[in-house]
Swiss-Prot record:
Disulphide-bridged cysteine pairs: 219-304, 229-258, 412-425
InterPro entries, per the entry: FIB_ANG-like, Fibrinogen-like_C, Fibrinogen_a/b/g_C_1, Fibrinogen_a/b/g_C_dom, Fibrinogen_a/b/g_coil_dom, Fibrinogen_CS
Region (Disordered): 20-82
UniProt domain comment: A long coiled coil structure formed by 3 polypeptide chains connects the central nodule to the C-terminal domains (distal nodules). The long C-terminal ends of the alpha chains fold back, contributing a fourth strand to the coiled coil structure.
GO biological process: adaptive immune response; blood coagulation, fibrin clot formation; cell-matrix adhesion; cellular response to interleukin-1; cellular response to leptin stimulus; fibrinolysis; induction of bacterial agglutination; innate immune response
Record lineage: Eukaryota, Metazoa, Chordata, Craniata, Vertebrata
Keyword Secreted: yes
PROSITE patterns cross-referenced by the UniProt entry: FIBRINOGEN_C_1, FIBRINOGEN_C_2
Keywords: Adaptive immunity, Blood coagulation, Coiled coil, Disulfide bond, Glycoprotein, Hemostasis, Immunity, Innate immunity, Secreted, Signal
Main location: secreted
Organism this protein belongs to: Rattus norvegicus (Rat)
Gene Ontology terms: cellular component: blood microparticle; cell cortex; cell surface; collagen-containing extracellular matrix; endoplasmic reticulum; external side of plasma membrane; extracellular space; fibrinogen complex
Name of the protein this chain belongs to: Fibrinogen beta chain
Amino acid sequence: MRHLWLLLLSVSLVQTQAATTDSDKVDLSIARGHRPVDRRKEEPPSLRPAPPPISGGGYRARPAKVDAGQKKVERKPPDAGGCVHGDGDMGVLCPTGCELRQTLLNHERPIKNSIAELNSNINSVSETSSVTFQYLTLLKDMWKKKQAQVKDNENVINEYSSILEDQKLYIDETVNDNIPLNLRVLRSILEDLRSKIQKLESDISAQTEYCHTPCTVNCNIPVVSGKECEEIIRKGGETSEMYLIQPDTSSKPYRVYCDMKTENGGWTVIQNRQDGSVDFGRKWDPYKKGFGNIATNEDTKKYCGLPGEYWLGNDKISQLTRIGPTELLIEMEDWKGDKVKAHYGGFTVQTEANKYQVSVNKYKGTAGNALMEGASQLVGENRTMTIHNGMFFSTYDRDNDGWVTTDPRKQCSKEDGGGWWYNRCHAANPNGRYYWGGLYSWDMSKHGTDDGVVWMNWKGSWYSMRRMSMKIRPVFPQQ
């Protein structure tokens, strides 16, 4: 029983790992994706608080020095030695003897006191004289310093006076001479700047007016022209380059690139993608009138022999396809250089009143019948939603696709990067976003969808072509 439980647990773990692995893979057959939530984001690091300055006790104040006062020791003079006479009478009878001593002793003490007082007065006068002398010496020193300061101040005043006089002279010369000259120079510079600003404004105005029309290039255009490129090749125009065509004599001629080499030539290029230099995520009016660069010239040639990235314009495409039976050739190339094509024997685009509805038939080729049959990776209803035949043209500001929803944000053109005959949404997306390198993923797209230059029936949803072009030509019997 224990072995049975271990076996069941192992099988469950293996199934869980397999399910996790399968969910991490990108299913290339899914035409649309969703923007996942990125759960790998890290929390922003928080700043560490700075440690506070070190605080607390420090050194104590130094103790004040104690003056070693010298105590005065009273020195009492020793008493005079006694005068002792062997005979007391002798002392009386002899005044210069012991009695004189007694008299002197009687007067000695007051005299000593007077002398001490005089000494004290002399010391006091001496100290006062010393202090007075020191004070006079200090006053003398201070007077000398003041005299020196006065002299220094006089020197500084004289120096400042000289500097001020020089500065006044410089200011006078500057005001009287240089400033008028500088003002004249500044006026001249101002006039020059005003002239340049006016020229820039004029150039900007001219450039703005120029940019209202589709981009053009300066190339020598062949003299030969016609209703379309097929008529031009029949008139002798055999070089693939930019020509003027005029499908209707009541309208002005316009420039197109004619492919005179592919499958006997005579093809009018209505769309071309090759380097991502032109943004195809545009509104209804640019797609109606056309946009991009028709052709460019090679370095060694004076004519425009290289096609640019452009959309010819829905009005022009509709006019060309309604002249008569028209065939469509779609060529594409991957980033390895491999090429395939889709050829439709019938191709018609209705007028703007009918929302430029598209019709195709008679497919043959190697790319897969994406326009008529939808994405080959899908089945049933999902595949039906990717069929383009019969659809109206849609742009992100004119929603005519087959995606019926109450959410105005859900529309194919907005999510898939360009204007096209979207259903819900596409098997082919020639006007999508240009991705360098081919392979891309939902997290690289703007809305999490397969919005590249896609032809699902050849490379699936998550591979954007390096080159893709659409060319039309009147149907005629081939010899």
